[in-house]
Amino acid sequence: MKVQRGDTGKAVVVLSGGMDSTVCATLAVREYGAENIGALHVSYGQRTAAREKQAFAAVAERLGIQTRLAVETPFFRAIGGSALTDANIAVPDAGELIGHEIPVTYVPFRNAHLLAMAVSWAEVLGASKIYIGAVAQDSSGYPDCRPEFYEAYNLAVRRGTKAGDIEVVTPLIALRKHEIVSLGLELGAPFDLTWSCYSREDCACGVCDSCVLRLRAFEGAGAVDPVPYAPRLAGHD
């Protein structure tokens, strides 16, 4: 995938601080220039909220994105229903069915809420594009990462915004995880600053869905993951 510098418009990037969103942000910077990007981070009551926010700030700084908005949406914790936001639901180890069923780490309709905030901010900034690093294939099977979800969401955005010219773009949605790593390496994405683990903030656990998918992706790309993992996976440090 060859990335070329595009127009001089503005864009908003939904930046969690994870691997996919960081590659997506790097793409957006290549397209628009860091000075025309707004980076949005949402702390929604997830277990690793503090570590993810730290990663967001570090990634944005490395990429030169100065326009940033970090918000909190505590209602996800009140709603519950996900291992990421409900302390009574354990984060499971990745199983053989990874990607074939919706896991307990799915946060109900989360991406719709994140995008709603991104659209609101985009209207204020005058941005015409919203980048989100959703991945449909080789992923955890979340329903709000499907292409048809974004097609429907864009229709709502066109009908529900003042100018109707804001578009949600998903440049990674058809890529495999190892292809995302390869693209990120090609672009110089700061993988060393990212955080993907669902359960730990000191070092990555290496066994949750997110960690396993990430480790497989780096292995598939023939690269070494630069983030620290728990001692039992010391060989991946």
Swiss-Prot record:
Organism for this UniProt entry: Koribacter versatilis (strain Ellin345)
Annotated catalysed reactions: 7-carboxy-7-deazaguanine + NH4(+) + ATP = 7-cyano-7-deazaguanine + ADP + phosphate + H2O + H(+)
HAMAP family (UniProt xref): QueC (MF_01633)
Role played: Catalyzes the ATP-dependent conversion of 7-carboxy-7-deazaguanine (CDG) to 7-cyano-7-deazaguanine (preQ(0)).
Family the UniProt entry places it in: Belongs to the QueC family.
This protein's name: 7-cyano-7-deazaguanine synthase
Tree of life domain: Bacteria
Residues where Zn(2+) binds: C197, C205, C208, C211
Cofactor: Zn(2+)
Pfam families registered for this protein in UniProt: QueC
Main enzyme class: ligase
Keywords: ATP-binding, Ligase, Metal-binding, Nucleotide-binding, Queuosine biosynthesis, Zinc
Gene Ontology biological-process annotations: queuosine biosynthetic process
Classification via CDD domains: QueC-like
Record-listed E.C. numbers: 6.3.4.20
Cofactor binding: number and manner: Binds 1 zinc ion per subunit.
